[in-house]
Each structure stands twice: as structure tokens, then as C-alpha cells.
Amino acid sequence: MCVSSSPTNTNRTLELPVSIDVVKLAKGEHKTDEFLRVNKFGQVPVLVERDYANDDDDSMRFVLTESSAILKYLSETFSRTVSASKMYAENEHDLKEKAKIWSAMDWYQTTIRSSAAGLSWHAFVAQNMGGALSLELSKHYEGRLKLSLDVLETKWLGDSSPFLNEKPHPSIADLLVVEDIVNLVVLKGSPFRSQLSSLEELLRTRPRIRKWIDAVSRLNRPAWDELHRVLEMAAATAEKKMNSVRGQSSFSSGSRSRAGSRL
């Protein structure tokens, strides 16, 4: 069984026996014939479960797309493992408990996910994918995100437990939702960063979300730190590049001014 893209972070955190294939979107690997044979939508994430006795026969593969569906499937598949035993439902036969988790995951898709992804794309990611950045759209999605974060802070999180639905332990919903928020660290590398709220600013007035992120990160701190080190590096690289361009621009402008004064 292998998974491409998120929810690979969940797999790493829980140390599930799943192999992870990295798909380089910036190089268009998700649009190659090889990838499209696996996922005709040409998108990530995708889970592939192979029958290795018939690995050359595509019909013997089980393919699943969409983060929520993949996480639910993995939770059911590995429900008896120590790391995942309570990440779905404390009682694997308790449909109502599972439904509460589904509810949080479904809410996230049209709120946190859509707004955070839109903000990240228009403020940072698009420039690495051959697209154009947009301050106007970045601000639009930032406004939507703030409203969604307020709902997360006041409705989904409480004081009796740091986790969603005030459950005594985390679930796959926590792992799914938290990623799109902490991934906003990439905004440090946006050319619009002075005109947008940073991740720290977004969380400053939302103490429950801060407590929740900290609790989720402690599930497997080494894995968490390694995952987010990559995001920090991407943001730092972009920021360094922007500063270099600004420096060259300032030098060029200064040279023209001095030349003009001599005429």
C-alpha cells in the first residue's frame, strides 16, 4: 500500500506500515501518463493498494482519492494497531462516535481547507507552479479563513480537552484539520507578507487553537518537526530570493539616480 501527498503526514505521525511516494507537482509529475494511469483525475492525494501477486494488472489495484476518504480507510484498516487504535473511534463498532469525526472532517473541507488553500496558493504557491500571485485574492481568502478560525476556536474546540469535539484523545479529524493551518507558515515567503496576517498573528487571539496545535504536535514530535522543517525551508528560500531581488532593484535604481545627477 502506498500513499502520495497528504495525508502522508498522518501516516508519518502514526508510523503506519504504508510506503509513501513523493509526487513533485512543480515538475508536473501528477500529469504524466504513468500517474494518470493510477489516478485519472491527475491530483493528489491518492492511495494505491496493490495485489503484488498481480502487480502488472491495473485491475488488481485498489485506488482511493480524497484526503478524508483515505484517512477513514487507513483508520479502519489499521484500527487494531497501537498507534491508530483510538484515532478513529475508541469503540470500532460505535457508528455515532465515527459520525462525529466525519462531521468535523466534512466541515473542514468547505471552511478551513478551502480558505487556507486559497490563501496559500494566491500568496505563495502559485509562483512555483507557473501561476500568478494575487494580493486581492489573498486578502479574500484570508478574510474567509479568519471567519473559519473563529468557528473552530469557539465551536469545535473547548476547554475540557484540547481536541476537536472536546474528545479525550485526538482523532484523524485533528490530524487532517491542523495541517492546513500550520502549513500557513509558508506565508513568510510571500511577497505580500507585510500586507497579510502571519500565522503567529492569526493564532495570537485564538488560545484554544494554539493549545490544540501544541497537543497534536506532541503526538510524535520528531515526525512533526521533520515535516514542518521542509515548510520553513521553503518559506526561508523564497524570502531570501525576494530580498535578493529587492537588493538588486535598489542598486539599479540608485545607479540610475547618480548617473542622472552627473548630466
Question: Language model features by range: what are they?
Answer:
Residues 1-136, 251-252, 258-263:
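GST-like domain detector, emphasizing the conserved glutathione-binding G-site
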Residues 41, 158-159, 219:
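Structured helix-beta-strand junction loops
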Residues 82-90, 116-118, 162-166, 194, ...:
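Short, hydrophobic secondary-structure boundary micro-motifs
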Residues 96, 100, 104-211:
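GST-like fold's C-terminal all-alpha helical module
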Residues 168, 174-263:
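Fungal C-terminal region signature
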